[in-house]
């Protein structure tokens, strides 16, 4: 389990996302 805050955040790359979230193919962190 990754430490990923459950917020809807648009992204283009993993580093755009907080915590251990990754940028998913739908364009949002998850």
Swiss-Prot record:
The modification Pyrrolidone carboxylic acid is found at residue 1. GO terms for biological process: negative regulation of serine-type endopeptidase activity. GO terms for cellular component: extracellular region. Disulfide bonds join 4-21, 11-23, 17-29. GO terms for molecular function: serine-type endopeptidase inhibitor activity. SUPFAM superfamilies: Plant inhibitors of proteinases and amylases. It comes from the Eukaryota. The presence of a 'disulfide through disulfide knot' structurally defines this protein as a knottin. Inhibits trypsin; probably participates in a plant defense mechanism. This is Trypsin inhibitor 3. It comes from Momordica cochinchinensis.
């Amino acid at each position: 389990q990754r430490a990923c805050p459950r917020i809807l955040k648009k992204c283009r790359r993993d580093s755009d996302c907080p915590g251990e979230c990754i940028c998913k193919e739908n364009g949002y962190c998850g």
